[in-house]
Amino acid sequence: MELPDPVRQRLSNLSLTVFGDSSRTGPESSDAADNEMVSSLALQMSLYFNSYFFPLWWVSCIVMLHLKYSILPDYYKFIVVTVVILITLIEAIRLYLGCMGNLQEKVPELAGFWLLSLLLQLPLILFLLLNDGLRNLPLEKAIHIIFTIFLTFQVISAFLTLKKMVNQLAARFHLQDFDQLSSSSAAVRRVRQCTEEL
C-alpha cells in the first residue's frame, strides 16, 4: 500500500524544505554515498517496542476509563473517548509509515510519520497526561509518561534520520547530474574529433 502520488510529492517537497542542509554548496566527497544505509536502528527498535507497548497502553486506557467514567463530567467523557479513538487510529498509521519510511528509506513516508508524531500524537498524549480535569489514576500517568517518552525519542530520531536521508538524496542527485554532464561533454569531444577528422 503506497501513498498517493500527490501526497508523496508534497511530503517530499516539505522534507526537502525542512530537512535539507542549506549550508552545503555541493555534494559531500564520499565514495560510498550510493551504498550508505541511512535508516536508523534506534528508530526502528523504538518503533518495534512501541508496537508491543501500544496494545498494553490501549487496554489499560480502556480499563482506567471504565473505572473513572462515572465520575467524569459529561464533556470530559466525550473528549476522552474521542481522544482515545483518535490516538488509536493515528498510531496504526504512524507505526506503518515509520516502519516503511525507515526500513525502505522513503522520505515521504518517514516525513508523514514525523508530522503525525509531532503535530497530532504528541499533543493528544500530553493532553491526556497533563489535564487535571481527567482525574488520572497512577497507572494512567505511568503509561502516558512511557508513551510520551517513546514519542519524544521517535520525533527526535526521525528528524535526524530524515535530515541524513535528504542530504544523501541530494548528494545522489548532484552525482547523477555530474555524471550526465561528464557523459555529455565526452559526447561533445567525440563529435569534435569526428569533425576534425573530416
From Swiss-Prot:
Keywords: Cell membrane, Cell projection, Cilium, Cilium biogenesis/degradation, Glycoprotein, Membrane, Transmembrane, Transmembrane helix. It holds the Pfam family Transmemb_17. Its main location: membrane. The keyword Magnesium does not apply. It is a multi-pass membrane protein. The chain crosses the membrane at residues 47-67, 78-98, 110-130, 142-162. It comes from the Eukaryota. One of its GO terms (biological process) is smoothened signaling pathway. Glycans are attached at residue 13. It is found in: Cell projection, Cilium membrane. GO terms for cellular component: ciliary membrane; ciliary transition zone; membrane; MKS complex. Part of the tectonic-like complex (also named B9 complex). Transmembrane component of the tectonic-like complex, a complex localized at the transition zone of primary cilia and acting as a barrier that prevents diffusion of transmembrane proteins between the cilia and plasma membranes. Required for ciliogenesis and sonic hedgehog/SHH signaling. Belongs to the TMEM17 family. This is Transmembrane protein 17.
